[in-house]
Amino acid sequence: MLEDPLRNLRYLTSSPGIGGKIKVYPEDFIVKEVIPKSIFRGGRCRIYLLKKKNWETMAAIKEIAKRIGIHYSEIGFAGTKDRHAVTYQYISICREVDLENVAIKDVTLRFVGYGRPLKLGLLLGNFFKIRVRDTTPELLPNILKEAKEKGGFPNYFGIQRFGEKRSVNHIVGKLLLLGKYEEAAEVFLGYPGNGMEGDEARKKFLETKNVDLALEEFPKFLRYERAMLYKYRETGSWKRSFLALPRPILRIFIHAFQSYLFNLYISRRIEEGFPLNEALPGDIVVQVKKGIPLRDRTYRVTESNLDFVNEKIMQGEAMVSGPIFGYSYRRSHGIPGRLEDEILEEAGVSLENFKRLPKPMREPGGRRELLIKPRGFRYKTEGRDVLFKFFLPKGVYATSVLREIIKPT
């Protein structure tokens, strides 16, 4: 049984959670993407608003491309959205083709204008409208009061980062980082999920290591697993088998392990009693503009600028950051630096490991704010249900806000 990578992470608030269930129905989790207005200045690509339900973003885009007879790479998008949800996001296509008449179940497309091609990351964030069912709503005010006093919610990466139904991405990432390609292949190919199609074939591969049998038994939709198996049969090298995968897939594994370490850093900081909304000497802070953290604009906190920086944090113009470990990330000093070193040491990896990765897997790293400060946060209770509405910057998980509020057992 795979361990939940979020299970042992500390909560920032000590107030009991409201409990409850999310995503009982797709309509319980509504996501609306926000992109910069500048996208619509100039540019000749057609921009559509894609509404989907029970579709992964990539699967929906591939289906749209198939229906109009083009390669899916011709359709641009800014961010991936949850599958078990109702989501609204923008897509671009740089040719004169009308998508509004494309008929796909649970997918609608509306033309909104002309603009520049969309690329991954080219969004400001997302509005969320989320229903949590069967809660104890009277506990909510205390949690929100305490979260406000402590500056917000812990900015943990959500379970989506590690694999929602089969949380192996971070384990594979660590093994790749250590150059243990055979073990990484065993985890990626062999670890079963939670009652997923293909689980029996995975288990059999883990027991037998029989590549030919796996190619017979692995379902066709496990295309990356099958591609690796074919490459191994051809080369006898698990390293070359991984490197045959598309770079975005390889990056998922490394990003997942970076995210796992970042989560451990936040949890350790809470555990040791250090604030997330107040800088310590040696911290690195990120600038904030109009509520959006600018993760590439950072500066170091020293004894001499400590009061000035904490004033900026109180005014909402800066936030304390944590490490996204990589070959050129900016390391903290002082107590925060000690915590970073301990996280790496306890995980059994070093910055050298990041530098030695094959080029397609190499990640520079960076900094990420420790807190989530939802904008326009509102809620209302409807019987035992609570309906939440808020905006989050890109790369921030609504499920991490809800985790602190619900405190799942």
Swiss-Prot record:
<dbReference type="GO" id="GO:0031119">
    <property type="term" value="P:tRNA pseudouridine synthesis"/>
</dbReference>
<protein>
    <recommendedName>
        <fullName>Probable tRNA pseudouridine synthase D</fullName>
        <ecNumber>5.4.99.27</ecNumber>
    </recommendedName>
</protein>
<dbReference type="InterPro" id="IPR001656">
    <property type="entry name" value="PsdUridine_synth_TruD"/>
</dbReference>
<dbReference type="InterPro" id="IPR011760">
    <property type="entry name" value="PsdUridine_synth_TruD_insert"/>
</dbReference>
<dbReference type="Pfam" id="PF01142">
    <property type="entry name" value="TruD"/>
</dbReference>
<keyword id="KW-0413">Isomerase</keyword>
<comment type="function">
    <text>Could be responsible for synthesis of pseudouridine from uracil-13 in transfer RNAs.</text>
</comment>
<dbReference type="GO" id="GO:0160150">
    <property type="term" value="F:tRNA pseudouridine(13) synthase activity"/>
</dbReference>
<dbReference type="InterPro" id="IPR020103">
    <property type="entry name" value="PsdUridine_synth_cat_dom_sf"/>
</dbReference>
<feature type="active site" description="Nucleophile">
    <location>
        <position position="82"/>
    </location>
</feature>
<feature type="domain" description="TRUD">
    <location>
        <begin position="152"/>
        <end position="373"/>
    </location>
</feature>
<keyword id="KW-0819">tRNA processing</keyword>
<dbReference type="InterPro" id="IPR042214">
    <property type="entry name" value="TruD_catalytic"/>
</dbReference>
<dbReference type="InterPro" id="IPR020119">
    <property type="entry name" value="PsdUridine_synth_TruD_CS"/>
</dbReference>
<comment type="similarity">
    <text>Belongs to the pseudouridine synthase TruD family.</text>
</comment>
<dbReference type="GO" id="GO:0003723">
    <property type="term" value="F:RNA binding"/>
</dbReference>
